[in-house]
Every structure is written in structure tokens, then in C-alpha cells.
Amino acid sequence: MRTAGERLPSMLDLRVICKRYVTQSFTQVALDSVSLSFRDNEFVAILGPSGSGKTTMLNVIGGLDHFDSGDLLIDGISTKDFSDRDWDAYRNNRIGFVFQSYNLIPHQSILENVELALTLTGVGHAERRQRARKALEAVGLGEHVDKRPNQLSGGQMQRVAIARALINDPEIVLADEPTGALDSTTSVQVMDLLKDVARDRLVIMVTHNPELAYQYATRIVSLADGKVTDDSDPFDATEAARREAKPTRKTSMSFVTALGLSARNLMTKKGRTAMTAFAGSIGIIGIAAILALSNGVNGYIKNGRGGHALKLPAYDFQTRLRPVVHDGRTGGYR
């Protein structure tokens, strides 16, 4: 049992995080001793000018970038010794990403785009399809499941990206400028959706739009020069209770799924596939010809022109005067 003064862990805890990008002649401090704790269901907006460290902090939280010093705690567990597999499991099981650029595959339907997020979880095809439909219905796109991204508006594509982020039921949704490429009306629609998402999970959003941030977010964190300059609602350690850790799921993709995705990609880009196959064939034929020629020459030399004496000029290096002829058949000199 915990004592009254014992600190209870938050869901996500950044402790004195530092991150620097070093070049040959310059060092950029992206995060300078950042300490923040997040609740498990709040809508946090990260504000600050360009270069203040907003996106870097989001990448560190999402495991896309690693901190140089400090620590990131998840349910009180340090990530200092996380392996690549641990980070993969963390991103796959607990994080949903929403980016400004949508990152949708153009030759697949939006249903297939959303479904793709489950291919590494070992979920069967029928269940993947069902959950993808449900996620698209939740964002108001249930009637557009067979359309491709180029048949949708910018706001609709961002909704697809949000559905893809939610299909794996993540505990944390990270949104990097989700309204940056949208008009004001569509931005409000996306913000309404994110606010609804934040009712039962943590949403951390980076934005340059303070009006939307103050209107929708439950907490505003301001950054400048890699430091936290303001926090409207800091986490209070005494308000939290220990959360039950969510079991991790093994990351895997079935052979049939991998084969199907590969075949779809090859058939979509037939011209490039044909050119690649043609170039590869030429390379293989060239290597085979070189090996055959090399073996033929070696055999020719070894057999001494079909059994005849192979005479190679040599010199007596002791006198350096008299030429000596080597008899390849007898092994002697004359």
C-alpha cells in the first residue's frame, strides 16, 4: 500500500528530457531539460514558434526519435533500456499517429488503408476488414469505404488518417499539425473529432493555431527554445491512481498478407516492375557469361591446349641472360 506522500505515476512522464542535433560545425538544442507528465484522458495542445521543439517532443513520446539524456516513463516504467523490439511493441500497441500529410497509399481504397494498420498485429483478414469499416463509420466515412484517397477532400483524407490511428485502439494519439493543410471549416470538423477521441484516451496535438488550441484542448503547454514556458493544467501526482498495464501484442505479419501486399504493389506499378525485371535479367545473364568464360579459360590453360605442350617464356633470373622455356606437359625447362 502506498503512503500518503508517495508519488503515483502518470500515464506518460518526461523527466528532464534533452535532445540535441549535432552537425560538424553546429549543435541545435531541440529539447532542453523538458519535464512533463500526462494524464490518461486529456486533450493537450503543444504551442510554440517554429523551431521550439514541438515536433521533436512528439517524436520522442512516440518512439520515433530517442532522447540524449533524461528519461521517458510509461506507466512508471523507464524506457532507457528499451530495445528496438520494445519500441516497436510500444508504437504498435499504445500509439496512434496522425500527421499533416495524411500518408495514405494512393492505389488502395481507404478501407484498405485503414486496414493496413492491423497487418502487423496478427489479426485475421475478416476481423481487420470489420474493424476498419467500424473505424471509418466512427469518423463519418462509412459510405466512402471503396473510394481511393484521390477521390476525397483534404478533410476526408485527414479523417481516414484518424480512423487508421484509432483502429488499433491506442491509449495515446499523437497529432502533428492535423489541421495545417485544411481550411477553417474543415479544421473545426477535425478538431471536433479529436476532442471526442480524447474523452477516453490521451491526445497530444502540436499546432500553430492558438485559437483552435484554446477552444478545444483541455490543457495548453507552451514551448520556446526547447523549454516549457507555460503549462495551463500541470499533472498533480496525488490525483492519479495506478493504472493497470496494458498487455503488449506481438508484432507479426502473416505470409499470405505480405504476399498479397507485395503482389498488389507490383501490379500497380507494372512499368517499373518490368524495367526492374529486365535490368535484373541482364545482370544475371552477364554474371553467368563471365563465370562461364572464366571457367573455360581456366580449363584451357590447365589442359595445355588440348594436350599439347604449353610453352610459356621465362627467364633465368640468376644470369638474366639466357631465356628459358617451360614445358607445361613434362614440368621441366629447356
What residues fall within each predicted segment?
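Conserved ABC ATPase "signature" region
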Residues: 77-78, 115, 119-122, 126-143
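Conserved signature/switch motifs of ABC ATPase nucleotide-binding domains
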Residues: 147-150, 167-168, 199
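Alpha-helical transmembrane segments
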Residues: 285-319
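Conserved catalytic loops of ABC-family nucleotide-binding domains
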Residues: 193-205
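N-terminal Sec/SRP start-transfer signal
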Residues: 246-282
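Helix-to-loop junction immediately C-terminal to a conserved catalytic motif
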Residues: 62
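Short coil-to-helix segment of the ABC ATPase nucleotide-binding domain corresponding to the Q-loop/switch region
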Residues: 108-116
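Conserved ABC ATPase signature
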Residues: 148-158
